[in-house]
């Protein structure tokens, strides 16, 4: 946003301000939106907890001990706390949808090439631009549609047919309860999330002409490997190179890790850890990477066969558990892939607030996936979920 900070939580960018509005902000201004603030993100917008060395840690309005998500965690927390009504986020691995889930609001990652990503930092202009979505975050589901219309513009809105009514009775509903991952870095789906998904499915089955149908994809077991391999499948800079180009003095991942251990690093642990991880992940030329890229393309086609050319949605958890405590995401690093897999599958997705957990008293929700350019189906189902289940709850009155 012109004149405001664009440091993305990186110490070497302290004080850097934007010299122009991002394209999405321009579109919102044209629609009459009044900017109130920019909000906190994770360092370089790479992690699903919004914490950095410049602005500190964003806390969850429902429980200050808990994570607000990332990378758009500040936006999610501000919306949940009624500090603003609407916001704009970006999502390349769930960065709109996880904050929406953790903070009990709504967020939509649009179909590719609908909302311009131009003017962001770090700017992604390579093949990954189709995985990145700039989209609306709202306290109320009914605000998603007019926001998406404003962000997308006339031509893109026409492609999405957002003005067409959706007959929910005619929609086919498919769902998945859990990703059966083999890694200790992914949590099992909690009972609260499982029950919430089940209740939404039960309601939609009573509404639609055909009952909801469970669909499991064996290749989802490798969701993280698919996401990572597709993200790294082309020519793109490594994180350490991006940090260096931002003015960081980071020289070697292991040296930086030693500095972090001694309290001398200017970077957060997730950023340092990811630079170390880059040295050990398989290269894009490796046999395993090529295999997972092929598996990802097959999975993309399976979803196209399921969702394209008909009114159908796919429901699944946005995240396997409600907002975890601060600093714990590093022990469950793969949890983000419930959201992230749909970035590389290039599908529109809406994170829907449903209710507060019975035991955790934290927001619990689901995500609604549709076929490419079928965003209107996600939004229609989100509005119905809000109407029936209530959506956002005032965190000051949660008890």
Predicted regions and their residues:
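Conserved beta-strand edge residues that scaffold enzyme active sites
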Residues: 41-43, 92-93, 218-219, 320-321, ...
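Short glycine-enriched, charge-decorated loop/helix-capping segments at active-site entrances
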Residues: 8-14, 190, 328-332, 368
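Short Gly/Pro-enriched turn/cap motifs at secondary-structure boundaries
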Residues: 15-17, 65-69, 97, 125-128, ...
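Hydrophobic beta-strand scaffold residues
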Residues: 35, 211-212, 349
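Gly/Ser-rich catalytic/binding loops embedded in alpha/beta enzyme cores
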Residues: 1-93, 307
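Short low-complexity, flexible loop/linker segments enriched in glycine and/or proline
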Residues: 50-54, 101-105, 226-233, 331, ...
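Amidase signature
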Residues: 150-340, 344, 373, 384-399
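Structural helix-boundary/capping segments
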Residues: 26, 30, 80-179, 198-206, ...
């Amino acid at each position: 946003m012109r004149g405001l900070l664009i440091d993305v939580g990186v110490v070497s960018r302290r004080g850097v301000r934007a010299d122009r509005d991002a394209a999405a902000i321009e579109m919102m201004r044209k629609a009459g939106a009044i900017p109130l603030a920019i909000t906190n993100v994770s360092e370089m917008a790479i992690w699903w907890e919004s914490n950095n060395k410049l602005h500190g840690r964003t806390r969850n309005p429902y429980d200050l001990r808990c994570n607000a998500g990332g990378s758009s965690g500040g936006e999610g927390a501000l919306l949940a706390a009624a500090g603003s009504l609407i916001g704009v986020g970006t999502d390349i691995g769930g960065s709109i949808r996880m904050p929406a889930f953790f903070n009990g609001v709504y967020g939509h990652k649009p179909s590719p090439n609908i909302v311009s990503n131009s003017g962001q930092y770090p700017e992604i202009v390579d093949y990954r631009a189709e995985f990145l979505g700039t989209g609306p975050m709202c306290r109320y589901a009914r605000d998603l549609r007019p926001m998406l219309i404003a962000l997308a513009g006339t031509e893109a809105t026409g492609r999405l047919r957002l003005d067409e009514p959706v007959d929910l009775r005619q929609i086919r509903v498919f769902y998945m309860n859990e990703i059966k991952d083999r890694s200790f870095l992914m949590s099992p789906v909690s009972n609260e999330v499982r029950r919430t998904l089940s209740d939404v499915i039960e309601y939609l089955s009573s509404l639609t002409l055909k009952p909801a149908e469970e669909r499991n994809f064996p290749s989802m077991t490798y969701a993280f490997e698919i996401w990572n391999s597709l993200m790294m499948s082309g020519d793109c800079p490594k994180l350490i190179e991006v940090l260096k180009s931002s003015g960081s003095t980071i020289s070697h991942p292991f040296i930086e890790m030693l500095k972090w251990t001694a309290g001398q690093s200017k970077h957060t642990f997730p950023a340092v850890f990811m630079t170390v991880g880059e040295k050990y992940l398989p290269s894009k030329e490796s046999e395993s990477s090529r295999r997972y890229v092929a598996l990802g393309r097959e999975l993309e086609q399976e979803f196209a066969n399921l969702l394209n050319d008909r009114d159908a949605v796919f429901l699944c958890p946005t995240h396997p558990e409600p907002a975890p405590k601060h600093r714990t995401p590093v022990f469950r690093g793969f949890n983000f892939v419930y959201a992230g897999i749909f970035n590389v599958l290039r599908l529109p997705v809406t994170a829907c607030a449903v209710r507060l957990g019975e035991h955790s008293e934290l927001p619990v929700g689901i995500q609604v996936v549709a076929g490419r350019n079928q965003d209107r189906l996600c939004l229609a189902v989100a509005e119905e979920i809000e109407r029936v289940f209530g959506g956002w709850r005032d965190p000051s009155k949660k008890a």
